[in-house]
């Protein structure tokens, strides 16, 4: 399991599911936001296998 830290840059929907673009390092990845209660732009999140698992307050190193 690889956990990465990112910042939500865009929120949308795809096929009835909540998705978003998350800035991870220098890359932008499209991920599922379905597990987050109320995602907003700029939220810091932990991502695993294309799914945002939780919001975080500080980067996890």
PLM features: what roles do these ranges have?
Residues 1-61:
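Exposed beta-strand/loop interface patches that mediate assembly or binding
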